[in-house]
Amino acid sequence: MSLEDHKKSIEDFGFTILNGVFSYEELQSITEALELVDKNKETSRVSSDLFAVRQFLKEIPSVVPLVFSTKLNSIINQLFGDNYFVVKSIFFDKPEKSNWYVSYHQDLTISVDRKNEALGFGPWTVKQNQFGVQPPLSILENMFTIRIHLDDTTSENGALYV
Protein backbone atom coordinates (compact mmCIF):
# COMPACT_ATOMS: atom_id res chain seq x y z
CA MET A 1 0.00 0.00 0.00
CA SER A 2 1.16 3.51 -0.72
CA LEU A 3 1.03 6.21 1.94
CA GLU A 4 -1.96 7.66 0.07
CA ASP A 5 -3.72 4.31 0.50
CA HIS A 6 -2.86 4.36 4.21
CA LYS A 7 -4.21 7.90 4.46
CA LYS A 8 -7.45 6.78 2.81
CA SER A 9 -7.69 3.83 5.20
CA ILE A 10 -7.39 6.23 8.14
CA GLU A 11 -10.09 8.47 6.67
CA ASP A 12 -12.42 5.54 5.86
CA PHE A 13 -11.85 3.22 8.81
CA GLY A 14 -10.04 5.27 11.46
CA PHE A 15 -6.84 3.22 11.35
CA THR A 16 -4.19 1.68 9.17
CA ILE A 17 -1.42 -0.86 9.67
CA LEU A 18 2.05 -0.11 8.35
CA ASN A 19 4.51 -2.99 8.34
CA GLY A 20 8.26 -2.66 8.05
CA VAL A 21 8.55 0.83 9.51
CA PHE A 22 11.48 -0.33 11.66
CA SER A 23 14.27 -2.71 10.72
CA TYR A 24 15.11 -5.70 12.91
CA GLU A 25 18.21 -3.83 14.11
CA GLU A 26 16.16 -0.76 15.05
CA LEU A 27 13.71 -2.89 17.03
CA GLN A 28 16.65 -4.57 18.77
CA SER A 29 18.04 -1.15 19.75
CA ILE A 30 14.69 -0.19 21.29
CA THR A 31 14.54 -3.54 23.11
CA GLU A 32 18.08 -3.07 24.46
CA ALA A 33 17.18 0.39 25.77
CA LEU A 34 14.20 -1.17 27.57
CA GLU A 35 16.46 -3.66 29.31
CA LEU A 36 18.18 -0.76 31.09
CA VAL A 37 14.96 0.55 32.67
CA ASP A 38 14.90 0.99 36.44
CA LYS A 39 11.98 -1.31 37.22
CA ASN A 40 11.71 0.04 40.76
CA LYS A 41 10.56 3.50 39.68
CA GLU A 42 7.01 4.59 40.38
CA THR A 43 6.27 4.80 36.66
CA SER A 44 7.09 1.09 36.21
CA ARG A 45 4.77 -1.78 36.91
CA VAL A 46 6.35 -5.21 37.17
CA SER A 47 4.66 -8.50 37.97
CA SER A 48 4.87 -12.10 36.82
CA ASP A 49 2.54 -11.35 33.93
CA LEU A 50 3.27 -7.73 33.02
CA PHE A 51 5.98 -5.13 32.62
CA ALA A 52 4.76 -1.61 31.90
CA VAL A 53 6.31 1.85 31.88
CA ARG A 54 4.17 4.97 31.98
CA GLN A 55 5.69 8.19 30.65
CA PHE A 56 7.82 5.91 28.51
CA LEU A 57 9.57 8.58 26.44
CA LYS A 58 10.24 10.70 29.53
CA GLU A 59 11.56 7.75 31.56
CA ILE A 60 13.74 6.37 28.76
CA PRO A 61 14.89 9.39 26.74
CA SER A 62 17.42 7.27 24.85
CA VAL A 63 14.53 5.68 22.90
CA VAL A 64 13.21 8.99 21.55
CA PRO A 65 15.55 9.12 18.52
CA LEU A 66 15.08 5.37 18.04
CA VAL A 67 11.29 5.58 17.99
CA PHE A 68 11.08 8.86 16.09
CA SER A 69 13.37 7.74 13.31
CA THR A 70 13.68 9.66 10.07
CA LYS A 71 11.37 7.10 8.44
CA LEU A 72 8.64 7.31 11.11
CA ASN A 73 8.82 11.11 11.18
CA SER A 74 8.42 11.17 7.40
CA ILE A 75 5.40 8.85 7.57
CA ILE A 76 3.77 10.94 10.31
CA ASN A 77 4.42 14.13 8.35
CA GLN A 78 2.91 12.71 5.16
CA LEU A 79 -0.15 11.27 6.91
CA PHE A 80 -0.87 13.97 9.48
CA GLY A 81 1.32 17.00 8.79
CA ASP A 82 4.04 18.43 10.99
CA ASN A 83 1.96 20.11 13.69
CA TYR A 84 1.88 17.29 16.25
CA PHE A 85 3.35 16.38 19.64
CA VAL A 86 3.27 13.44 22.03
CA VAL A 87 0.52 13.49 24.67
CA LYS A 88 1.05 10.01 26.12
CA SER A 89 3.62 7.24 25.90
CA ILE A 90 3.26 3.84 27.51
CA PHE A 91 5.24 0.62 27.10
CA PHE A 92 3.62 -2.76 27.75
CA ASP A 93 5.22 -6.19 27.74
CA LYS A 94 2.53 -8.76 28.31
CA PRO A 95 3.93 -12.29 28.04
CA GLU A 96 2.01 -14.90 26.06
CA LYS A 97 0.82 -16.80 29.14
CA SER A 98 -0.34 -13.64 30.91
CA ASN A 99 -3.90 -13.64 32.16
CA TRP A 100 -3.98 -9.87 32.58
CA TYR A 101 -7.26 -8.90 30.95
CA VAL A 102 -8.22 -5.47 29.69
CA SER A 103 -11.76 -5.04 28.44
CA TYR A 104 -12.53 -3.14 25.27
CA HIS A 105 -12.11 0.57 25.87
CA GLN A 106 -11.06 3.83 24.28
CA ASP A 107 -8.12 5.78 25.62
CA LEU A 108 -9.54 9.27 25.86
CA THR A 109 -7.14 11.00 28.24
CA ILE A 110 -3.97 12.89 27.48
CA SER A 111 -1.05 13.41 29.84
CA VAL A 112 -0.29 16.95 30.96
CA ASP A 113 2.38 18.38 33.27
CA ARG A 114 -0.01 20.16 35.64
CA LYS A 115 -3.68 20.58 36.40
CA ASN A 116 -4.98 23.76 34.87
CA GLU A 117 -8.76 24.01 34.67
CA ALA A 118 -9.86 24.80 31.13
CA LEU A 119 -13.28 24.80 29.51
CA GLY A 120 -14.16 21.41 28.06
CA PHE A 121 -11.30 19.53 29.74
CA GLY A 122 -12.19 16.88 32.31
CA PRO A 123 -12.45 14.68 34.22
CA TRP A 124 -8.96 14.74 35.68
CA THR A 125 -6.87 11.80 36.89
CA VAL A 126 -3.44 11.29 38.42
CA LYS A 127 -1.43 8.12 37.74
CA GLN A 128 2.14 7.78 38.99
CA ASN A 129 2.31 11.53 39.63
CA GLN A 130 1.23 12.28 36.05
CA PHE A 131 -1.89 14.36 35.48
CA GLY A 132 -4.30 13.10 32.85
CA VAL A 133 -7.38 14.77 31.45
CA GLN A 134 -9.95 14.11 28.77
CA PRO A 135 -9.79 16.92 26.22
CA PRO A 136 -12.79 18.19 24.26
CA LEU A 137 -14.03 16.13 21.32
CA SER A 138 -12.60 18.68 18.86
CA ILE A 139 -9.12 17.81 20.13
CA LEU A 140 -9.71 14.04 20.37
CA GLU A 141 -10.86 14.01 16.74
CA ASN A 142 -7.49 15.42 15.67
CA MET A 143 -5.31 12.95 17.58
CA PHE A 144 -3.68 9.77 16.36
CA THR A 145 -2.07 6.79 18.07
CA ILE A 146 1.10 5.05 17.01
CA ARG A 147 1.47 1.50 18.25
CA ILE A 148 4.82 -0.21 17.75
CA HIS A 149 5.12 -3.97 18.20
CA LEU A 150 8.61 -5.18 19.10
CA ASP A 151 7.71 -8.81 18.47
CA ASP A 152 5.78 -10.69 15.80
CA THR A 153 2.11 -9.79 15.96
CA THR A 154 -0.70 -11.43 14.05
CA SER A 155 -4.48 -11.27 14.12
CA GLU A 156 -4.37 -14.25 16.49
CA ASN A 157 -1.98 -12.78 19.07
CA GLY A 158 -2.38 -9.04 18.52
CA ALA A 159 -3.22 -6.88 21.49
CA LEU A 160 -5.35 -4.24 19.82
CA TYR A 161 -8.84 -4.49 18.42
CA VAL A 162 -10.06 -1.63 16.22
Residue ranges and their predicted role:
Residues S2-F13, F22-V162:
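Non-heme Fe(II) oxygenase catalytic core, chiefly the N-lobe of the double-stranded beta-helix
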